[in-house]
């Protein structure tokens, strides 16, 4: 393909539809696998590298971040949860965010709303990621403190003081937990379930959780994947590790004319053209393939390599 050769707009649109359809199919399939108790499967309790609550009806897995918190507050080291997160991320970066996470699916569905989408710049993305950093910090501090008290057998007073925050702090206000566990519990999908974060009455904490969920989904209608960008502590961990993943994105400089179509369709606001062509090592990249499908010059591709070091922006 020469610099003058371009794929027609019709073919680009068709490729984007195919990628979106494939991704939606895989997201729904994985959601069904995670909730395989519907089909009679047993609960495994295995941590999956997605944001999903342990208390969701029919789930056979738990979200790795929930397992990370729960293990710490139980007085143990979260080797399994962290191992799953790091292993998956070192291989595929944040691809699970783009192709497997149930709350990512929820955001993608909301993103179809006919609203004028906004493209926050890199500075805003970096500044607002403070919330994800704060959530991670709270999880670690509470997890280590409660875990240490539990290990020594002196955790009763601490747990009484922290209440529902003493087991898995982020799960208490996680919009994924509200959407997939609390709301189904409230509408009676599984009346025998008993968990303190399910909130069996419509108290103030329930309404605060619901308000946070609504605020997140409203924001997502205008800023695609806003929760993944700014609020998800699991995404924060995976993004930093993903800069060194074996599977990544590269750009062919001989084909690329820097038209910017790739950046316009990126749901995470990655500034692809700011990176060296050998590897786009952005912590926000979820390998959704939207940019690959949108490029009229076929200049972008998924590559498999061992990065020598994290690519620095120009």
Predicted regions located by residue number:
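Cysteine-cluster motifs in flexible loop/terminal segments that predominantly coordinate metals
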Residues: 228, 259-262, 285-291
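Short linker/helix segments within small regulatory modules
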Residues: 275-288
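Walker A/P-loop NTP-binding motif of AAA+ ATPase domains
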Residues: 266
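Aromatic-flanked redox-active Cys/Sec active sites in thiol-based oxidoreductases
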Residues: 253, 297
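Membrane-embedded alpha-helical bundles of multi-pass integral membrane proteins
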Residues: 2-231, 236-247, 270, 292, ...
